[in-house]
Amino acid sequence: MKGWGWLALLLGVLLGTAWARRSQDLHCGACRALVDELEWEIARVDPKKTIQMGSFRINPDGSQSVVEVPYARSEAHLTELLEEVCDRMKEYGEQIDPSTHRKNYVRVVSRNGESSELDLQGIRIDSDISGTLKFACESIVEEYEDELIEFFSREADNVKDKLCSKRTDLCDHALHRSHDEL
């Protein structure tokens, strides 16, 4: 009877470890996809487009303390993007990395809407995957909204690694793999 207890304990530990790995792969993949989508949307904005920021109160001398800032990285634009970005997770599929056996999430619909130019070999595409990825994305946006706005309000190199691995700990490994833009 003692042997069964140890077997049950071992099975519980193994299942818990597998679930934790799956959850971490999911949240890491959602973070990486979120960063890709935000970088894409920011790059699409005309760099000359600005927005007025500051106080709209009139000072005693009749002037206002208003500053023009680039719209692409403004808090207003980033907040707007964060409200919609997770809807794009339906454009991602799941792929198992053959060398690490970890799940990656890759775009399965190109940015121009055509899928004929994509290699979809070995990628699972279904509503369960996109649904769980969207939920993970929404959880990340809710929990790390301030960090996301802070990171994207200024240009930075290697945002995926800095945000997803170092700042939020959603990825347990540095993200040195390429993630081609479509």
From Swiss-Prot:
Its main location: endoplasmic reticulum. A motif (Prevents secretion from ER) lies at residues 179-182. InterPro entries: CNPY, DUF3456, SaposinB_dom. The keyword Disulfide bond applies. It is found in: Endoplasmic reticulum. Keywords: Disulfide bond, Endoplasmic reticulum, Phosphoprotein, Signal. The modification Phosphoserine is found at residue 115. Residues 1-20 form the signal peptide. GO terms for biological process: negative regulation of gene expression; regulation of low-density lipoprotein particle clearance. GO terms for cellular component: endoplasmic reticulum. Residues 24-175 form the Saposin B-type domain. Disulfide bonds join 28-171, 31-164, 86-137. Pfam families: DUF3456. Interacts with MYLIP/MIR. Belongs to the canopy family. Positive regulator of neurite outgrowth by stabilizing myosin regulatory light chain (MRLC). It prevents MIR-mediated MRLC ubiquitination and its subsequent proteasomal degradation. This is Protein canopy homolog 2. It comes from Mus musculus (Mouse). The lineage of its organism: Eukaryota, Metazoa, Chordata, Craniata, Vertebrata. The gene is Cnpy2.
